[in-house]
Amino acid sequence: GVVADSAILESAGINRETASSYGRLLTNLFAIEEVPAWWTNRLKRLVQLRKRYVVDTGVLAAVLGVTARSIRAHGDLLGRVLDTFVMAQLRAEAAVSEAQPGLFHLRTQEGRHEIDILLEFGGGEVFGIEVKASGAPGRRDAVHLEWLRDQLGSAFIGGVVLHTGPRLYPLADRIVAAPMSSLWSTPRDPAVG
């Protein structure tokens, strides 16, 4: 989710100016990256807060003092680490992609809808990505992507629920479940063999 600056300030016991200086330093050192909130006038009540990511999941684990075993044992932490990992992969691929998509996130103000990552292409087309710490996500894991598809119509060119399992399969119209490994390889379609 998106953490408001006020929550970070209060938790760290620092003022806004100090937090801003630390944030600039960490960004300049390429330790964190801020991903902007996606916005369109076609949707109402979208949160405009940037989402912060630690650039490297290995550094994230070291700072938190956690091991792979402890990450796997805590579902929320695993989800956040996987989300960070996927964003890092997409950031690298988007930088060298001919299409040069913008990377965003989406969350409505009341929190009813949240999509981990949005790719926006030059013509305004949008591709949504949900990251799940599950080996076999179901249609309920695509509910926010379906909502966005229904809101945007043809501007929504597709969506994927990335997961930890090995299979590629359809979830809904223009939405599939695919293994995270498909970020760097072609997933095997069980229908093809």
Where do the model's predicted regions map?
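Residues at alpha-helix caps and immediate loop-helix transition turns in enzyme cores, especially N-
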Residues: 140-144
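Short beta-strand-loop-alpha-helix junction that forms the active-site gateway
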Residues: 131-139
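Accessory nucleic acid-recognition modules appended to NTPase machines
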Residues: 1-126
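Conserved nucleotide-binding/hydrolysis micro-motifs of P-loop NTPases
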Residues: 59, 135, 166-168
